[in-house]
């Protein structure tokens, strides 16, 4: 059995030059609570379809990397009983027949391997606060320096060190552009407070940028920052209070590594009365729609 298997619908779409959008599964397994996670996973696939593209949710089932999951496979990953798998974990999962949800790093790698050019997610991983001591930097960043995939996201998760993350992306040579904005998106917030050098004004410009990468000999991906509209963002003062208390609790409990992001996302959900969860859903659905529209323009060659 091949270690990477696109679903028949995905394989047919790629063979026919039709637009395909990859979706990660860590959002399902660790990013959202049950039963919202499965509902949002289905909503993302439906959002991609409504914009005229084929969704390819990525995950590992029984040691096989599936690019495009069926209903039972989605339910398995939504059960909360599977681990996160980054790109480095894929060989071990394949060798042991394990199942797991793919992070941005693993999803970008597998999408690129199959020839998928667009990938939608909520927020990237990045440089954690205090990384000078912990060296805790997400593998998502290095993966995007190697995988020629455009990732549509709402910046990086606002619990991270956003300026340091942008510096790291620059060091790695990964282009970062805003969609109709010269400010880097702040995940739950419209604006992270970090300026961008470049922006694209529509889906056509975004598609042209993606097409330009291989011709220029750049084998990397690109980050397309798609901010929430101001009226849809989390209240900034509420965000600040939740972040401050979450970081204090994190330090008190000594939580580190892979457990940091799920803990803080759950802390945000509790401290905001579920408002962060609703903002997360809004932003990831918007990103899926935008990625599908860009994929459609890319497939049309214009």
From Swiss-Prot:
<dbReference type="GO" id="GO:0046113">
    <property type="term" value="P:nucleobase catabolic process"/>
</dbReference>
<dbReference type="InterPro" id="IPR007342">
    <property type="entry name" value="PsuG"/>
</dbReference>
<dbReference type="GO" id="GO:0004730">
    <property type="term" value="F:pseudouridylate synthase activity"/>
</dbReference>
<dbReference type="Pfam" id="PF04227">
    <property type="entry name" value="Indigoidine_A"/>
</dbReference>
<keyword id="KW-0464">Manganese</keyword>
<comment type="subunit">
    <text>Homotrimer.</text>
</comment>
<keyword id="KW-0479">Metal-binding</keyword>
<feature type="binding site">
    <location>
        <position position="104"/>
    </location>
    <ligand>
        <name>substrate</name>
    </ligand>
</feature>
<feature type="binding site">
    <location>
        <position position="136"/>
    </location>
    <ligand>
        <name>Mn(2+)</name>
    </ligand>
</feature>
<comment type="similarity">
    <text>Belongs to the pseudouridine-5'-phosphate glycosidase family.</text>
</comment>
<dbReference type="GO" id="GO:0046872">
    <property type="term" value="F:metal ion binding"/>
</dbReference>
<keyword id="KW-0326">Glycosidase</keyword>
<feature type="active site" description="Nucleophile">
    <location>
        <position position="157"/>
    </location>
</feature>
<protein>
    <recommendedName>
        <fullName>Pseudouridine-5'-phosphate glycosidase</fullName>
        <ecNumber>4.2.1.70</ecNumber>
    </recommendedName>
</protein>
<keyword id="KW-0378">Hydrolase</keyword>
<feature type="active site" description="Proton donor">
    <location>
        <position position="24"/>
    </location>
</feature>
<dbReference type="InterPro" id="IPR022830">
    <property type="entry name" value="Indigdn_synthA-like"/>
</dbReference>
<dbReference type="GO" id="GO:0016798">
    <property type="term" value="F:hydrolase activity, acting on glycosyl bonds"/>
</dbReference>
<keyword id="KW-0456">Lyase</keyword>
<feature type="binding site">
    <location>
        <begin position="138"/>
        <end position="140"/>
    </location>
    <ligand>
        <name>substrate</name>
    </ligand>
</feature>
<dbReference type="GO" id="GO:0005737">
    <property type="term" value="C:cytoplasm"/>
</dbReference>
<comment type="function">
    <text>Catalyzes the reversible cleavage of pseudouridine 5'-phosphate (PsiMP) to ribose 5-phosphate and uracil. Functions biologically in the cleavage direction, as part of a pseudouridine degradation pathway.</text>
</comment>
<feature type="binding site">
    <location>
        <position position="84"/>
    </location>
    <ligand>
        <name>substrate</name>
    </ligand>
</feature>
């Amino acid at each position: 059995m091949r270690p990477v298997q696109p679903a028949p619908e995905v394989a047919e779409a790629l063979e026919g030059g039709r637009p395909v959008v990859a979706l990660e599964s860590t959002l399902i397994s660790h990013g959202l609570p049950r039963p919202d996670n499965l509902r949002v996973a289905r909503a993302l696939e439906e959002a991609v379809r409504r914009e005229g593209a084929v969704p390819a949710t990525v995950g590992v089932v029984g040691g096989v990397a599936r690019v495009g999951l069926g209903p039972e496979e989605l339910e398995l990953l939504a059960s909360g009983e599977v681990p996160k798998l980054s790109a480095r974990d894929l060989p071990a999962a394949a060798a042991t027949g394990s199942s797991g949800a793919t992070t941005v790093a693993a999803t970008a790698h597998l999408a690129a391997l199959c020839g998928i050019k667009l990938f939608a997610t909520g927020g990237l991983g990045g440089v954690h606060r205090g990384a000078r001591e912990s060296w805790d930097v997400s593998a998502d960043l290095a993966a995007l320096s190697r995988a020629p995939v455009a990732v549509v996201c709402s910046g990086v998760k606002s619990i991270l060190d956003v300026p340091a993350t942008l510096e790291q992306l620059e060091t790695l040579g990964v282009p970062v552009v805003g969609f109709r904005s010269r400010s880097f998106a702040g995940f739950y917030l419209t604006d992270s407070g970090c300026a961008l050098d470049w922006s694209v004004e529509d889906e056509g410009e975004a598609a042209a940028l993606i097409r330009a990468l291989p011709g220029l000999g750049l084998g990397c991906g690109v980050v397309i920052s798609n901010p929430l509209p101001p009226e849809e963002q989390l209240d900034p003062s509420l965000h600040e209070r939740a972040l401050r208390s979450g970081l204090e609790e994190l330090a008190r409990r000594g939580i580190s590594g892979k457990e940091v992001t799920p803990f803080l996302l759950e802390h945000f959900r509790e401290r905001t009365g579920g408002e962060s969860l609703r903002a997360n859903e809004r932003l990831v659905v918007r990103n899926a729609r935008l990625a599908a529209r860009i994929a459609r323009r890319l497939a049309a060659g214009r």
